[in-house]
Amino acid sequence: MLRFHFDIKDGGGIHRDEHGEMCTDHQAAEAEAVKIAVEMVRHGIGQWTHFDRAVEVRDESDEPFVRVRVVAKLETQRLK
């Protein structure tokens, strides 16, 4: 098992994950980043009309090796 850090990037900068999580390999860490991104949308899309966040995953080198970005727009149009 390897320790990976899942940093969150948003309009306010980067929120570093200092603790990290254990994953079996880089592919598993990338899959976890996708899950985190989906959860961010699920919990945040109703609070903003535009949602732009990214999860950057760092490995033991402390350098990001993958970024999962989510961009969503919430738009309501009253038709009647």
At which residue positions do the language-model features occur?
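Short aromatic-glycine-(Arg/Gly/Cys) micro-motifs in beta-strand/loop hairpins
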Residues: M1-R16
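A short, exposed loop/beta-hairpin motif centered on an aromatic-Gly-Thr core
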Residues: R16-T24
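C-terminal structural segments of small proteins and small subunits
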Residues: G46-K80
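Short arginine-rich
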Residues: I36-G46
